[in-house]
């Protein structure tokens, strides 16, 4: 049998030949200890050249491809490939793992880099987005992540001279990144004209924002900031692969084989051409270079490492070499010397010295080499080639002996016979040829038995036989030398084989897994002397087995290091070493063999540490020495805890059923009942599959769990309190070291762990997101700060948490088999143990990972199943209890001894100050001394020892003990049978709590007149429970079979019980003794009922689909009810005892008459009229509403009606207990629901007086007692029930503003489309017509006239070089709220419009701007904490949440200096609609516009997301932290108010409860304010304000406003509250009100705006002033004393602002907009001077040349002329029906041109007076008119139209001018056209969907500004006829800039916004002289 166990010898990696030079760069460095660190295959290597020694880091599970050295040069980071690749940070000195970073990248990790102080690490993934990720590597935590680039990234580096900046480069790009908050923002490097767009391969950062980079063409590109400033051409002749910066300068290495050294300013120092040196060769390519002092390390493509001493740079020293690229298959060992020969597809054959660890010979062949062999005397070396030939060389000097090619396909294997006379050659064409060595390798035979390619050969010792393996796994034998096949097994039996390298054969059966027919083992080699076998497989694993190993699935030891397939493995000639070669990693590994006898001395070579386990996990088999599992444990391991439907699935399921629900809920439904129930007592304790889940709290209460309830039991008062935060079975529980907090873990799809306070029963933290299916074990650390947990997913994941923060610290896969226990080391918080099935593992934390080592059992014991574990009195000592009753004692990871403790498993153990206590399946509690040597005392749990005060009865003696705990002078014991007992130290035992044992519980009956109930269960017991305050089990009786139903007779004397075998019995209700029993049915009895009154009949329903009716007195069956098509589920009698109502499994509701059982058909209307004695039916019209929307996945299993017929209680498959008002007609009734049971509620019953409800949990085995709190009965705290699932269908109220805000869809700037309905080909895509007069360059013709009349500029035409934002007229009030705040004691106000945050000085009106947002700002808040003064947070729109630059984001910035402090990229798709700071100012809350309206909490300074959760399915308008809290906040929205708590990383919410106020309905809530003592005020759509105490509505302030209350503000200093609403101004009312702290008294303020309705969107209160923002884009300051209003900011109410005109001589301008106003603005005074209400939307506006008249064009086709002086109308006219798009006075003031969307321009002669008769018009315009310009002489008009065409017309005739030459000679008075050759350059490449909307040329005629649909203002030179002209661009507007103009003297540019209704004034910066 020993053959099946793992061998007891061992391999230790001694040397690796090779270095990974292919496909990697920059992977070779000097460490601080002057050692060399690099990697090969899956191993990190630290090589000491001085001692010629290697150390290995083996924490990776696949190929390493990237490496970075920490700045202190001791720590190394390496990254690997794989599906779930990870990064290891390890110590190059000890080669131990320091940290593991995982769970972020996929595919692989391409680049790594540490920052300057080594705190952060950046990594780049190999995924399609090439994700860039920044880590806090010590904590294993990701700080930020962003998509890197669409193509490969080759190098990344931190800028060591600027904080938070990085540079990355790769295919055709270089990117400069800045890290702020959690946002990584890239800027692409601009190649410009300086250099070609190139692939950049490597880079290094220098001072002064300089970056040096190496390009693919061999140039070095030098960058300043993001711009390329120069190139150093021809630095190398080909691509520069590596660049290394050091103190002296830079070293570069390239594909040309050269190393160049540069000084710090990148001036060349020297060049070293490696190809020219002694060791060089053609094609040498440098992949890595490292320069330290006078040494340079070089790594090459062909896996060499050179060291160069700078002084002797032509003599490089070769310190490592390996095979080059190409698969490596050939391996042979020398028969007499310690040499190994390898041959590869790189065509080289190499001989290695195993003693000196060096390459001693190398020879290049013509063909790739696939196999090798050395003959017995060591003279000849044969090589098999890929082309079918083989070559024989002399080993001595590598000269050729012979070259033979007999085959066309690859030679896979060749071997010399032991006597040296023959050579056997196996080929891919399935033949083996035999050659005679002495006859100069003449072919002497061939073996042709195989049908597939030959894989392995072995000779017999006498050279007479050959055995082969082929690709089909067949093993064949041949006689030598002829090659005749041997088929007789007898002949072969006696053959002794000289070597064993075959993979199939009896002797190696054990190397294959038991049930597998795969052929992934590539090579084996037998060591006959050591009786071991080594194998190599496709997964990079080397295994040691015993030899021979005859039975499949033998145990082994495994060793990792190779990354992919290991192609060959051989013992050295003296069996000292094993040599293995990697196919893809081209590496040669040399392992030292340590035989068994040496192991004793070498305990230090305990299993080496690695993330992949080096011990034989998979090699489990039915080993004889593993005891069979104990039945109890066996049962437990079969529990999967999987659910068909998890509670988490309900929201999605409901979503799917939405349509069904909508149709049903259109009808008004009954309210939920007024009654509520409260959980009062639970009979039950979960012992059957849990351990150590029972503890004393600080104050001596007992805490444990059952079902989904955490129970705190007070044993003095016999009362319980409950933690009801879980929604499914709790599987584990542990107590905090201070005994006040408890952690419980539950079942779930994403199961949670709750940490809660046993005193307040409030959750402190909820941990989730890292387990699946359930959490099976938890444990606190000794300091109470950390928590370890284990999941029940397939890998039994182990997680270490910082539970207060709710953060995962580390995670690892635990084991394939179930883990029962996790324990944290009390002395070292970074260590823990897990124990479970055949498993004991010792873990330590390494960054984000955990490194586990299996307990080392040695010869002492066997690999047993561990059920419990504790730590001893030092950090090394641990103790575990096994399934066989032993206690194992461990030191470090070694088993030192075992002690027999119990018969059967040890389920629980506990460490005391001076010893231990253990409990086992044998029902004995044992006390031990502190070294487990003596058992001091035992207590047997027996009925005899029960003390008189016990609350129940022991079911049996010596029940299996599952939990033990000590405290308060007692031992607390929990048993498998669901009992909790207290053992006094002196011996007596008190039973405290008990419940049913394992097995479903269905039967429940309440007594007709006493507070007792009976239950019967599959555990084969019938029990009677006392429901009065003594809460105990009164009687119990064992049954021969389990039962599913029971019933008391009406007089309470008899109890009928239905059993599962089809029998039933009647028992005496007091003594439980049998009265009578019957067995008439085969299937289980499902319901049993006595008829009412005297109880004359007994109805017995069974799963056979029959109901039998018995006469109780005569004990005879009198009737059978037939006709049901399925099993019976419920029966009820009518009050007369004549009629039975029956429910069946097919959802039939049937009626039968007693006693004969005749079927009756009763119409449903009649059913209601029948008086029923009981109602437990779940079918029928009266209870239609109890079926949930998701009825398909969940059944309602039970119901029970109160005796007053008012309230129906139901229980369902999801564990919900619900109360409905009866009758529940109509679908989906409203209810109150309660969670406590975990899964199926199998039965519910009211007690005889309806004072209590008793419910049974089917699989949680618990009996719960609830008290019924009648309507009208009001206790201090209403019960927490969850309200109905369906959102209230009451109308939440209507208001146009609210509806618009709710339905608005925000588009991001990048996706914006054109605002005008343009058609046609864009100008830059049109074919250009050849101009007629392409004049010769020299010409006598007169010069072309000016394009533009340039006036009032004089001689100095200075171009404009920049625009600076100076003023904004506008405020976003239309769909935002609470976005105007005071700063600096009211001197400044802060608000926003478009994408700009505005700081506005109240006194001077001057503004400064925050312009870092790249899209519209939607919300703004100010931090109120004095530590964070003037800190503002703003949230913006965005598109999807891929964390790229267009993702929605929040900026936190300083309002005074506009510095960005943090940027938070959000996962809220669409945008961020609300932000709020917490009381300490450190947390920020944000709400998204995504469909789930996600709520997220951030630690904004670190950019860390703490918690996130779906908020509500409808729009949330505002969420705000309570001003005194960092954990409590409130959200309001459409028909929604929720009260939230942040617990760790979890967000818990409670819906606002309305039930306490009559007629309260859930309205749409719009605003929030707070008061003391947990008061919250919410403003509603109707104008009421709701007042909430905690989460319960306690008062309504009716009509606080007459319209929606949009804004509320809580003043922190005095608690007064400001509200703002939507109202018509009236004498007593006002749109703004100031209230006292409790919203009882108020003072109203009127806003004197002159509007018909004031709609307030934002309020804020300063010192004596109230700041108000309105829907009309006004910001008003109201004095509290005098109520005086001062308007600070004006803006247009609705946009777009199409019309814009600047005054001809003054700094005024006019704007006209959709809101029907024209406004006059003064730039110098920074204010609005005047506004005219036109009553219709205005589209265009224009000043006359003198500035005395204004023309306005309207949307309805009318135009108006006003006199500026009086604003009186001079004239108006309407000749068109459609909008006027542009209107112009001619320069001589004679004509007015009016362009409209009717494709026409009308001319009016103004000299004819205000009658305004049209004198002519332009026809034939192909599309609507956009802009018009007059010529300087008023004779021509240029018109641009909606089909991208420009036309010129004569004035006033309207004739179309076609002559290009004539047009070219016109001088224009103004230029606002976006069309024409002169402005072709303004059209950008990216304008497929978007247009340039407006343009304006400066008065100087040399500058041009444009506005476009992306919201950009651009500055060009004029004219700009070249396509895609250079320009500067200015952001700030929302999408669509609709108009733009220069003011007089070109002092300013004014731009008008479409979506943002704002006017931006930009100051022009002219070029200095």
UniProtKB/Swiss-Prot annotation:
It holds the Pfam family Beta-prop_EML. One of its GO terms (cellular component) is cytoplasm. Residues 1326-1337 have a biased composition (Basic and acidic residues). The keyword Methyltransferase does not apply. One of its GO terms (molecular function) is microtubule binding. Residues 609-633, 1274-1297, 1326-1355 are annotated as: Disordered. WD repeats lie at residues 59-100, 104-145, 148-187, 195-233, 235-273, 280-321, 323-362, 406-445, 449-488, 561-601, 725-766, 770-811, 814-853, 861-900, 901-940, 996-1035, 1038-1077, 1080-1120, 1236-1276, 1412-1463, 1467-1508, 1511-1550, 1560-1598, 1600-1646, 1691-1731, 1733-1774, 1775-1814, 1887-1926, 1932-1969. The keyword Plastid does not apply. Keywords: Cytoplasm, Cytoskeleton, Microtubule, Repeat, WD repeat. Residues 619-633, 1281-1294 have a biased composition (Acidic residues). It is found in: Cytoplasm, Cytoskeleton. SUPFAM superfamilies: Quinoprotein alcohol dehydrogenase-like, Soluble quinoprotein glucose dehydrogenase, WD40 repeat-like. PROSITE patterns: WD_REPEATS_1 (PS00678), WD_REPEATS_2 (PS50082), WD_REPEATS_REGION (PS50294). Its main location: cytoplasm. Belongs to the WD repeat EMAP family. May modify the assembly dynamics of microtubules, such that microtubules are slightly longer, but more dynamic. This is Echinoderm microtubule-associated protein-like 5. It comes from Homo sapiens (Human). The gene is EML5.
């Amino acid at each position: 049998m020993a053959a099946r166990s793992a061998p007891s010898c061992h391999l230790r990696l001694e040397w690796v030949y090779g270095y990974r030079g292919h496909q990697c760069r920059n992977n070779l460095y000097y460490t601080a200890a002057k050692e060399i660190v690099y990697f090969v295959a899956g191993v990190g290597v630290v090589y000491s050249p001085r001692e010629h020694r290697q150390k290995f880091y083996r924490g990776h599970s696949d190929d390493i491809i990237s490496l970075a050295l920490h700045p202190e040069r001791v720590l190394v980071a390496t990254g690997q490939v794989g599906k779930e690749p990870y990064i290891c940070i390890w110590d190059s000195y000890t080669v131990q793992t320091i940290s593991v970073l995982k769970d972020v990248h996929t595919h692989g990790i391409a680049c790594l880099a540490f920052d300057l102080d080594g705190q952060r690490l950046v990594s780049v993934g190999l995924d399609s987005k090439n994700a860039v990720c920044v880590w806090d590597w010590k904590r294993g935590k990701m700080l930020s992540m962003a998509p890197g680039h669409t193509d490969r990234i080759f190098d990344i580096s931190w800028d060591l001279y600027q904080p938070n900046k990085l540079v990355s480069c790769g295919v055709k790009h270089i990117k400069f990144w800045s890290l702020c908050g959690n946002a990584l923002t890239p800027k692409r490097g601009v190649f410009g004209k300086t250099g070609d767009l190139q692939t950049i391969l490597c880079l290094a950062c220098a001072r002064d924002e300089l970056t040096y980079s190496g390009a693919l063409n061999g140039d070095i590109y030098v960058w300043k900031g993001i711009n390329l400033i120069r190139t150093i051409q021809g630095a190398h002749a080909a691509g520069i692969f590596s660049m290394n910066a050091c103190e002296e300068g830079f070293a570069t290495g390239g594909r040309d084989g050269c190393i160049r050294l540069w000084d710090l300013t990148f001036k060349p120092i020297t060049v070293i051409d490696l190809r020219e040196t002694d060791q060089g060769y053609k094609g040498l390519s440098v992949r890595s270079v490292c320069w330290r002092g006078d040494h340079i390390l070089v790594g090459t493509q062909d896996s060499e490492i050179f060291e160069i001493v700078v002084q002797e740079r032509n003599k490089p020293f070769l310190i490592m070499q390996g095979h080059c690229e190409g698969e490596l298959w050939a391996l042979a060992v020398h028969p007499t010397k310690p040499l190994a020969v390898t041959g590869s597809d790189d065509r080289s054959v190499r001989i290695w010295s195993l003693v000196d660890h060096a390459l001693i010979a190398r020879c290049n062949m013509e063909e790739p080499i696939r196999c090798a062999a050395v003959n017995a005397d060591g003279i000849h070396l044969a090589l098999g080639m890929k082309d079918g030939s083989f070559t024989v060389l002399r080993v001595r000097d590598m000269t050729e002996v012979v070259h033979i090619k007999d085959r066309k396909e690859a030679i896979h294997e060749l071997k010399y016979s032991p006597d040296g006379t023959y050579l056997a050659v196996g080929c891919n064409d399935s033949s083996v040829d035999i050659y005679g060595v002495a006859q100069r390798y003449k072919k002497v035979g061939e073996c042709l038995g195989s049908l597939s390619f030959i894989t392995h050969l072995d000779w017999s010792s006498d050279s007479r036989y050959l055995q082969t393996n082929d690709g089909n796994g067949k093993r064949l034998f041949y006689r030598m030398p002829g090659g005749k096949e041997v088929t007789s097994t007898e002949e072969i039996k006696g053959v002794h084989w000289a070597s064993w390298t075959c993979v199939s054969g009896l002797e190696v059966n054990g190397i294959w897994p038991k049930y597998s027919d795969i052929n992934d083992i590539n090579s084996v080699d037998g060591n006959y002397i050591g009786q071991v076998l080594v194998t190599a497989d496709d997964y990079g694993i080397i295994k040691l087995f015993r030899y021979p190993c005859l039975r499949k699935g033998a145990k082994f030891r495994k060793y990792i290091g190779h990354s992919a397939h290991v192609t060959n493995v051989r013992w050295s000639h003296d069996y000292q070493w094993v040599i293995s070669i990697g196919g893809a990693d081209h590496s040669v590994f040399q392992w030292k063999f340590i035989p068994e006898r040496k192991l004793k001395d070498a305990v230090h070579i305990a299993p080496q540490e690695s993330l992949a386990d080096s011990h034989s996990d998979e090699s489990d088999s039915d080993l004889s020495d593993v005891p069979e599992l104990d039945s109890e444990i066996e049962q437990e391991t079969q529990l999967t805890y999987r659910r068909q439907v998890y509670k988490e699935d309900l929201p999605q399921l409901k979503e799917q059923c939405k349509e069904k629900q909508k149709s049903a809920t259109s009808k008004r439904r009954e309210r939920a009942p007024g009654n509520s129930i409260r959980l009062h007592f639970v009979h039950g304790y979960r012992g059957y599959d849990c351990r150590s889940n029972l503890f004393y709290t600080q104050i001596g209460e007992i805490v444990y769990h059952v079902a989904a309830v955490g129970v705190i039991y007070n044993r003095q008062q016999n009362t319980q309190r409950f933690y009801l935060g879980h929604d499914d079975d709790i599987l584990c529980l542990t107590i905090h070291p201070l005994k006040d907090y408890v952690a419980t873990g539950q079942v779930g799809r994403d199961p949670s762990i709750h940490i809660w306070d046993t005193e307040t029963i409030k959750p402190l933290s909820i941990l989730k997101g890292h387990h699946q299916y359930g959490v099976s074990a938890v444990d606190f650390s000794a300091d109470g700060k950390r928590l370890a947990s284990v999941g029940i997913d397939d890998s039994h994941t182990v997680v270490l948490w910082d539970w207060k923060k709710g953060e995962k610290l580390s995670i690892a896969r635990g084991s394939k088999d179930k883990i029962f226990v996790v324990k944290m080391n009390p002395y070292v918080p970074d260590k823990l143990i897990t124990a479970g099935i055949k498993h004991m593992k010792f873990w330590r934390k390494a960054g984000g990972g955990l490194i586990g080592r299996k307990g080392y059992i040695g010869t002492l014991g066997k690999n047993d199943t561990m059920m419990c574990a504790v730590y001893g009195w030092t950090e090394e000592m641990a103790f575990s209890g096994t399934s066989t009753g032993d206690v194992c004692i461990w030191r470090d990871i070694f088993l030192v001894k075992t002690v027999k403790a119990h018969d059967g498993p040890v389920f629980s153990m506990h460490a005391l100050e001076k010893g231990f206590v253990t409990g086992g399946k044998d029902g004995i509690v044992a006390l031990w001394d502190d070294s487990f040597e003596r058992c001091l005392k035992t207590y047997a749990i027996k009925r005899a020892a029960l003390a008189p005060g016990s609350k129940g009865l022991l079911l049996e003696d010596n029940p299996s003990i599952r939990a033990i705990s000590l405290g308060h002078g007692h031992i607390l014991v929990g048993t498998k049978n669901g009992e909790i007992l207290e053992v006094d130290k002196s011996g007596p035992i008190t039973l405290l709590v008990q419940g049913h044992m394992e097995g479903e519980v269905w039967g429940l009956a309440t007594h007709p007149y006493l507070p007792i109930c009976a239950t019967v269960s599959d555990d084969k017991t019938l029990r009677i429970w006392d429901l009065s305050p003594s809460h105990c089990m009164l009687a119990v009786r064992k049954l021969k079979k389990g039962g599913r139903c029971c019933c008391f007779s009406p007089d309470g004397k008899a109890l009928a019980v239905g059993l599962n075998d089809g029998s039933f019995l009647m028992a005496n209700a007091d003594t439980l003794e049998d009265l009578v029993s019957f067995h008439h049915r085969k299937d289980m009895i499902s319901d049993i009922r006595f008829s009412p009154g005297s109880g004359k009949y007994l109805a017995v329903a069974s799963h056979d689909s029959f109901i039998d009716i018995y006469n109780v007195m005569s004990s005879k069956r009198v009737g059978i009810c037939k006709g049901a098509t399925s099993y019976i589920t419920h029966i009820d009698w009518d009050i007369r005892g004549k009629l039975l109502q029956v429910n069946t499994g097919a959802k039939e509701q049937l009626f039968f008459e007693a006693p004969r059982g005749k079927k009756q058909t009763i119409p449903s209307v009649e059913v209601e009229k029948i008086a029923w004695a009981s109602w437990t039916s779940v079918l029928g019209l009266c209870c239609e509403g109890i079926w949930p929307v998701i009825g398909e996945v969940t059944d309602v299993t039970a119901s029970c009606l109160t005796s007053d017929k008012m309230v129906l209680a139901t229980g369902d498959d999801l564990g919900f207990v619900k109360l409905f008002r009866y009758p529940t007609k109509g679908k989906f009734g409203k209810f109150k629901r309660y969670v406590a049971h975990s899964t199926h509620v199998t039965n519910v019953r009211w007690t005889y007086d309806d004072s209590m409800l008793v419910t049974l949990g089917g699989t949680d085995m618990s009996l719960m007692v609830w008290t019924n709190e009648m309507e009208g009965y009001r206790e201090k705290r209403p019960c927490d029930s969850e309200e109905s699932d369906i959102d209230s269908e009451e109308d939440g109220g209507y208001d146009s503003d609210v509806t618009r805000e709710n339905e608005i869809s925000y588009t991001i700037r990048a996706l914006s489309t054109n605002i005008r309905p343009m058609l046609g080909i864009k100008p830059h895509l049109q074919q250009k017509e050849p101009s007629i007069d392409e004049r010769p360059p020299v010409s006598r013709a007169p010069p072309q006239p000016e394009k533009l009349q340039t006036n009032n500029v004089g001689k100095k035409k200075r171009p404009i070089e920049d625009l600076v934002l100076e003023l904004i007229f506008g405020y976003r009030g239309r769909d935002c709220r609470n976005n105007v705040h005071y700063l600096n004691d009211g001197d400044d106000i802060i608000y926003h419009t478009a994408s700009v945050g505005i700081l506005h000085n109240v006194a001077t009106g001057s503004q400064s701007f925050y312009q870092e947002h790249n899209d519209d700002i939607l919300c703004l808040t100010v931090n109120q904490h004095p530590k964070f003064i003037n800190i503002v947070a703003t949230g913006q729109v965005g598109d999807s949440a891929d964390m790229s630059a267009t993702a929605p984001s929040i900026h936190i910035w300083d309002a005074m200096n506009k510095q960005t402090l943090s940027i938070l990229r959000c996962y809220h798709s669409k945008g961020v609609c609300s932000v709020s700071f917490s009381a300490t100012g450190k947390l920020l809350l944000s709400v998204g516009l995504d469909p789930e309206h996600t709520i997220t909490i951030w630690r904004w300074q670190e950019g860390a997301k703490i918690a996130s959760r779906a908020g509500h399915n409808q729009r949330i308008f505002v969420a705000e932290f309570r001003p005194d809290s960092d954990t409590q906040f409130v959200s309001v929205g459409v028909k929604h108010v929720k009260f939230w708590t942040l617990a760790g990383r979890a967000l818990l919410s409670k819906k606002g409860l309305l039930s306490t106020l009559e007629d309260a309905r859930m309205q749409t809530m719009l605003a929030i304010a707070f008061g003391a003592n947990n008061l919250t005020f919410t403003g509603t759509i109707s104008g009421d304000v709701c007042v909430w105490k905690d989460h319960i509505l306690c008062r309504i302030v009716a009509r606080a406003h007459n319209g929606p209350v949009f804004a509320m503000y809580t003043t922190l200093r005095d608690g007064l509250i400001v509200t703002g609403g939507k109202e018509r101004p009236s004498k007593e009312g006002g749109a703004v009100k100031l209230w006292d702290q409790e919203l009882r008294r108020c003072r109203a303020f009127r806003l004197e705006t002159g509007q018909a309705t004031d709609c307030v969107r934002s309020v804020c209160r300063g010192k004596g002033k109230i700041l108000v923002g309105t829907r009309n884009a006004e910001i008003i300051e109201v004095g509290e004393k005098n109520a005086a209003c001062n308007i600070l900011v004006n803006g247009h109410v609705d946009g777009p602002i199409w019309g814009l005109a600047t005054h001809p001589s003054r700094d005024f301008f006019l704007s006209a907009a959709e809101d029907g106003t024209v406004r006059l603005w003064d730039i110098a005074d920074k204010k609005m001077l005047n506004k005219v209400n036109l009553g219709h939307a205005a589209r265009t506006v224009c000043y006359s040349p003198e500035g005395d008249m204004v023309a306005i064009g309207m949307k309805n086709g009318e135009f108006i002329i006003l006199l500026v002086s009086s604003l009186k109308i001079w004239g108006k006219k309407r000749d068109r029906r459609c909008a006027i798009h542009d209107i112009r006075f001619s320069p001589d003031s004679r004509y007015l041109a009016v362009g409209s969307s009717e494709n026409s321009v009308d001319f009016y002669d103004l000299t004819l007076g205000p009658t305004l008769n049209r004198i002519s018009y332009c026809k034939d315009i192909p599309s609507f008119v956009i802009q018009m310009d007059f010529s300087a002489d008023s004779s021509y008009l240029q018109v641009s139209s909606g089909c991208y065409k420009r036309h010129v017309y004569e004035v006033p005739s309207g004739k179309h001018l076609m002559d290009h030459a004539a047009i070219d000679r016109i001088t224009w008075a103004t230029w606002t056209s976006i069309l024409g050759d002169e402005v072709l350059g303004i059209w950008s490449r990216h304008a497929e969907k978007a247009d340039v909307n407006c343009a304006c040329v400066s008065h100087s005629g040399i500058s041009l500004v444009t506005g476009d649909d992306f919201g950009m203002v651009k500055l060009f030179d004029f004219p700009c006829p070249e396509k895609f002209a250079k320009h500067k661009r200015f952001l700030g507007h929302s999408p669509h800039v609709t108009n733009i103009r220069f003011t007089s003297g070109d002092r300013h540019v004014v731009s008008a916004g479409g979506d943002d209704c704002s006017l931006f004034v930009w100051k022009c910066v002219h070029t200095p002289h």
